[in-house]
Every structure is written in structure tokens, then in C-alpha cells.
């Protein structure tokens, strides 16, 4: 039996390198690579793109669109890691745990878009509550999130690594900073479309002086609702939604042992995995709650999710290589 052929277009980038590393040791697939001197040769890329079973695109948005235009074979499946097609018609959103039946859609699709890191954490928290009517679709959602600097790609990684090397590991001039202050972050559209919310969420991302890891925080002012759910009801709804899932873990409710020193929720605790953890914190007296997702921005937020989707697209056990 022939092994499925996989081509990573953009394997030299941050996400591409991570995916290559996860796939390179596997003996159930065949990785096809392009010579470094041919990476910008459209004819050579088109030849490879049309000769494989699955092409994984790890490219900027415009380059991803160009790559898709080069594929003429209906036998080639495409998994795109850019933001170009995450809300596009004809593309299946590659978050297997998003809805019942999402895996089947991914398995049967020719075109699959890999989710963004922030949306993965956000949707893992919010989608179950909207889908089950625990929160109304009109609920005003705010997101505060922080990612390690690897989320900024090679240029930001080099900036931080250079400073750490010069200062022998000292904290950089940018220990923490918020951005996206024009409220036009590229992830908002997919957050809105795939959550079921009536209006886009207000999203404030940040970067911290640590390489990998992510916390996505969603405060819920439940006092704005006529009949607000309790913290336990929120936790129960999310836990039931993900019952039996391998890669979405819902933390125990009110368990201080999950916090570092009983106080802090560490952004880096699941680095190197394809897991997103969901936490629910609540005070029923004040009718306030906080949802938090913790994930590796390069794992379930990027390359891990891509490998999971690839496995589903090939009809393989989705935990292979993870």
C-alpha cells in the first residue's frame, strides 16, 4: 500500500518547521520537500502541489491564495494554516471539537482551514455555552489574551532571542505589552463566525516575554442576565460538551491544586502538547465568572492542530504523532 504523500509549502517558517518536525519521524506517510532554490518557483511548486495527497500551506495569506490557485487536481486535499480561508465558503473550519459532526466535515473536505491560536482558545470556552443556550448569542463578549513571543513569527522570535543573548537571559525591554488597539485583529472575524455570537467579540491580545504558551481570558458579567447560570452550571455545560475528547480538557471546578502556588494560572503548563485546557472560575454571589483557555500557541494553536487535522483528512487515528 502506498504511503500518503504530504507537501508542506512554507516548511521553513515557524509553523512549517514545527509541522515538519512532528511529521518527519513518521513511517506511515511520505514527506515531499522542495529545494530551497525552488521555493519561489511557481512551476515547481505547482508540480509538487498537484502530485501529493495533502498539501499543507504555511504561508502568508496572499501566498496561500496563490498556492491554492496553483492546485488543479481534485484529488489533492489542502490544509491551510493562514487566515486566508478560515471564514471562506467552500472551506471547512479545522477545529474538530467545535461542533458535533465537525470531524466528519473535515474528513470529507478537500479544503480545510487550520484555526488560529487565539480563536482556538476562545472557541473552546465560548462555543459550548452559545450552542447549548447557557449564554444568549447577544451576550457582549470581551477577550483578554496573552501569547508567548513565538506567536509573532521569526522576526519577533529573533528580536527577543537577540536581547536575551545580549543580556544573558535578563528580561527584555518588552516584558508585556498589549496590541491590536485599533480593534481590527485578523482573528476577530473567525471568532465571530464560528462562535455563534450575534456580534463580534471585543478582543485585546498581548505578548509576554516567554517563548511559548497562551492564556485566553473571557470575563462574564453574569449580573447583566435576568436568570444567570451558576458557575457550576457553566462548568457542567462545558464539561459535557467535551466529554470523551482527547485534546480538550476541562479542568475541575474550584480546584486550587491546578494553580501554581495555589494562586497563579501558568501560561506555559501545556507547552509541547496538542491540548487546550478550559477553566471556569466563578463567584455566584457577585454573579461574575471567568473562562480561561490555556494552550501552546505552537501546539493546539498551530502545528499540533494541523497534524490532528491531517490525520483526520487521511482517515488515520487523530492522535498519531501527537
Curated annotation (Swiss-Prot):
Q: Which Pfam families match?
A: Semialdhyde_dh, Semialdhyde_dhC_1
Biological process per Gene Ontology, one example term: L-arginine biosynthetic process
A molecular function (GO) term: N-acetyl-gamma-glutamyl-phosphate reductase activity
Q: In which pathway does it act?
A: Amino-acid biosynthesis; L-arginine biosynthesis; N(2)-acetyl-L-ornithine from L-glutamate: step 3/4
Task: Tell me the superkingdom of the source.
Answer: Bacteria
EC annotation from Swiss-Prot or TrEMBL:
1.2.1.38
What is this enzyme's class at the first EC digit? oxidoreductase
Q: Does the keyword Cell division apply?
A: no
Q: Which reaction does it catalyse?
A: N-acetyl-L-glutamate 5-semialdehyde + phosphate + NADP(+) = N-acetyl-L-glutamyl 5-phosphate + NADPH + H(+)
| Key words, A-Z | Amino-acid biosynthesis, Arginine biosynthesis, Cytoplasm, NADP, Oxidoreductase
Give the annotated active site: 117
Q: Where found?
A: Cytoplasm
One CC-aspect GO term: cytoplasm
Q: What is its main location?
A: cytoplasm
What family does this chain come from, according to its entry? Belongs to the NAGSA dehydrogenase family. Type 2 subfamily.
Free-text function comment from the UniProt entry: Catalyzes the NADPH-dependent reduction of N-acetyl-5-glutamyl phosphate to yield N-acetyl-L-glutamate 5-semialdehyde.
Task: From the Swiss-Prot or TrEMBL record, give the protein name.
Answer: N-acetyl-gamma-glutamyl-phosphate reductase
Its source organism is Trichormus variabilis (strain ATCC 29413 / PCC 7937)
Query: What is the phylogenetic placement of the source species in the record?
Result: Bacteria, Bacillati, Cyanobacteriota, Cyanophyceae, Nostocales
Q: Which gene encodes it?
A: argC
